[in-house]
């Protein structure tokens, strides 16, 4: 009996490790139980990709688009991953470098608008396959490396423009990626084509999202401090009263504040340390959906908008939730 007890005690750590490894959600507040079902599981849909970002669900076709290095890929239920567009950077670039598109969104006519990281611009892809540049500079200086974007219902596009090429250390003998600006910015391109600088005091602005009523704008900052900031949106589209929503610099898990989306109740689904953090409109961290790789962005998908798709380094994941998301 004693030997059996010793054996069982010896096996206990194994059982505990298996339980931790199988954990899908860290629940920090009872409010999360209404959002994430008790039996919810993170499902891996694809792996072995390059460095994926910018997921966007195509409702008409029932598939997901996402950026992958210098291409846009497509994931279709029952078919898997295929190439949607094989080259999104117009210049030469070493294999495996992140110079293609990043954030993706549709306009009111269903045309794709993209943050073109390497081309340093915001561009709209027309139905005849031509490209219309919506913005590529401010005050005659080229953007740094447009990262993520969100479209307001009136047609205005808000986007982040961090100085990331310094971090990527891409070979650049012709100084193609040399920045003209001494700051990272958040901008708006109005429906009429005017470019406006809204924020310039964030070190590395990244993900960006509106509240459901578009009266608040959320912006992620990746480093050196890891936090999300929230702004009031004036009737004219300008921003004011910026304040910190949540700081996660002290969290030990891998990952930084990156892409994010909101649900119809106003909760924020923000990729960051450990996976996707669920944050209330008041800035309370309700819990984290754990992702096996460093999560970069997320998007609402499926017919009912209750599936959250997550791009994470080389893998594509999803999880079914009880709530529907706000979709462009």
Each PLM stretch: what is its role?
Residues 1-4:
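Positively charged n-region of N-terminal signal peptides that target proteins for export
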Residues 6-18:
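Bacterial N-terminal signal peptides
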Residues 21-328:
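Sequence-structural signature of mature extracellular/luminal beta-sheet repeat domains
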